[in-house]
Amino acid sequence: MRVPEVKQTHFTLIKLVKQTGFTLIELMVTVAIVALLASIAFPMAEVAAQRSKEQELRYSLRQIREAIDSYKQAWDEGRIQKTLGESGYPPELKDLVGGVKDAKSPEEKYIYFLRSLPRDPMSIDEQATAEETWGKRSYESPPDDPQEGDDVFDVYSLSEREGLNGIPYREW
């Protein structure tokens, strides 16, 4: 038995082609859904990036503050040469990295408190050195109005922005 041939006309071919493609409305709905998803994801990515920088800031502040405390402890123990009128805190941040002579070491070894000084992750000045990215408070300076002086008692961010918790970075 023979199957009859179906005669394909121009009209049936056009109908088949139209059924295989996307309509303009389907395309517009797809673009709208993708745009909606992107508008939700973009702010979340910005918050995640800011949160990452804030974690880096917390870590850097803790690292520098622990090094300053270690310097003060070494000074209190007499391992750093004492001079009349000094507070016992490092004169500059670079002293934490460059090291100081151990006064109790017969070989005059150096004591190092940091391997490298971290940059303030909130600093926008790419040309500044790591030390220049931090605000420095001296021992003689009041806590509510930090000023530089003869030593470095504490560090803070110079950024004017606020953290996700609503507290300005310079108050961390």
Language model features by range: what are they?
Residues 46-52, 80-83:
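Short helix/strand-bridging catalytic loops that position acidic/His residues to coordinate divalent metals
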Residues 32, 41, 49, 106-109, ...:
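Short, functionally important structural connectors and interaction interfaces within domains
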Residues 6-18:
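Intrinsically disordered, low-complexity linker/propeptide segments enriched in Ser/Thr/Gly/Pro
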Residues 2, 18-45:
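N-terminal single-pass transmembrane signal-anchor helix
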Residues 69-172:
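Low-complexity, acidic interaction segments enriched in glycine
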Residues 49-76, 88:
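Membrane-proximal N-terminal amphipathic helix
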Residues 27, 51, 149:
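Exposed loop/turn and edge beta-strand positions of beta-sandwich/beta-sheet ligand-binding modules
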